[in-house]
Amino acid sequence: MSNLSGKVQTVLGPVDPEQLGKTLTHEHLTMSFECCYHPPPAGDEAVAESPFQMQHMYWLRQNPYSCHENLLLLQETLAVREELLAYRKAGGGAVVENTTTGIQRDLPTLRQLSKDTGVHIIAGAGYYVDCTHTEDTRRMSVEKLSDVIVSEVLHGADGTDIRCGVIGEIGTCWPITDSERKVLKATAHAQSQLGCPVIIHPGRNPAAPAEVVRILQEAGGDISKTVMSHLDRTIFDEGELLEFAKLGSYLEYDLFGMEMLNYPYNSEVDMPSDSQRVKALAFLVKEGYEDKIVVAHDIHTKNRLTKFGGHGYSHILKNIVPKMLRRGISQRQVDKILVDNPKEWLTFK
């Protein structure tokens, strides 16, 4: 294991885990999501290409991936800075920034945002989904990919001395591609060397999370130090959810604030409401998984920032926590979900 044992690695350096406080485990502060642009519905092309206007905000909430400008969160650093200050004022302490190679990770900006706001920011190492892999990435062996990931954690990424504190979000599709499978194996190898946290973006199929776990386990990964993201858009059946929970990963509900009628990446998915997400958390708590739940918003488009009428990074603290308490989740359990579980996950072995 690395000499980071017992520490959390932020963009400003290692810190004691007790310093983190309330932590959002899956956010983006600066990124491009143009890799996943989806054409607008027929007849809506003019709206999709027009400048942001208040009259179009509802359309953007329903079609966030069909407007090129909306996918460029990296253009809104000043707005994100103000959001982080508001998040800290609301009681937030840390954010895990999940932008990896392929979607324009910007470590110097993350470092500056942390300095400016006092929010601990943990950056992600590794690679996103297959469509963002370069030919060089595809040609790399598992060993070489692992070496790159380890270096991003121990020495710094993207030509900087800014070190990542988590591997991920590691992107996978459904079915998992050959290139993604190599990255998963490399992730497991790197994790076994470093004793570090890992976070996964699973494909949009109920079987995807368990298949990822199987690949990681067979390659030597530590599932107890791994977060499975996006469960709120992936596993809907309670029985299937409990079967997956038994595998031992952290269970992340990370699309709070995102409510849409039609999910373009999988038309079979009915995106849940925030009330349904809270209901799922209460179910998992009742079933004994309060020590394995983490939450976030996964903000990755402009329209979800408060600047553009969105919910922002403080939504969970201001709006979801009171709802959790009203739905039978105790304050102690809320504290586990927001403070203790992220702290345990992020601490290097």
UniProtKB/Swiss-Prot annotation:
GO cellular component: cytosol
Residue positions binding a divalent metal cation 2: 169, 201, 230
Subcellular location: Cytoplasm, Cytosol
Residues where a divalent metal cation 1 binds: 26, 28, 169, 298
Organism: Tetraodon nigroviridis (Spotted green pufferfish)
Keyword Hydrolase recorded: yes
Cofactor: binding comment: Binds 2 divalent metal cations per subunit.
Catalysed reactions listed for this entry: N-acetyltaurine + H2O = taurine + acetate; N-propanoyltaurine + H2O = propanoate + taurine; N-acetyl-L-methionine + H2O = L-methionine + acetate; N-acetyl-L-isoleucine + H2O = L-isoleucine + acetate
GO molecular function: N-acetyltaurine hydrolase activity; zinc ion binding
Protein name: N-acetyltaurine hydrolase
EC number: 3.1.-.-
Main localization of the protein described in the UniProt heading: cytoplasm
Record function comment: N-acetyltaurine hydrolase that catalyzes the hydrolysis of N-acetyltaurine into taurine and acetate. PTER also acts on other N-acetyl amino acids (Met, Ile, Leu, Val) and N-propionyltaurine, but at lower rates.
CDD domains for this protein: PTE
Cofactor(s) this protein cannot do without: a divalent metal cation
GO biological-process terms attached to the record: catabolic process; regulation of appetite; taurine metabolic process
